[in-house]
């Protein structure tokens, strides 16, 4: 936080932050979960996995069969129970099973380590550094604790994300 305050001492909005103390730490917010995991760099760095859970699909058919007025549907879709003209309608009456959530892993400033592929396993989007494009830059990647594009691609093969983006690359 001190680093941020040195470049932006006064911000026009509040910042809530939690300093990460562990190798891995999980946080839950209202609409998503965040996992921070330590990666291998010359200074403390973390990768992040963000997961947004998704509720089940709303069943119009079940709502109609239960006689639920259309005016109640939106609140039921958002997980609220609704009382209407003496009847109580609950989300479980009209919502299907929870669907697979949306997940993203973001990881830069690191050497390739197994933990990265584990966290990125089957995610929707894996954003990973590929600092060096040429094979002869491997020694630079090791020295500066970064990855080559080939090393990042190998992590991608292990993780099998639905999509992968390489970023943080060097023009040299």
What are these regions (language model features)?
Residues 21-166:
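Metal-dependent phosphodiesterase/nuclease catalytic metal-binding core
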Residues 1, 18, 161-172:
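Divalent metal-dependent hydrolysis catalytic cores, especially in the metallo-beta-lactamase
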Residues 1-19, 53:
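Active-site HxH/HxHxD metal-binding segment of metal-dependent hydrolases
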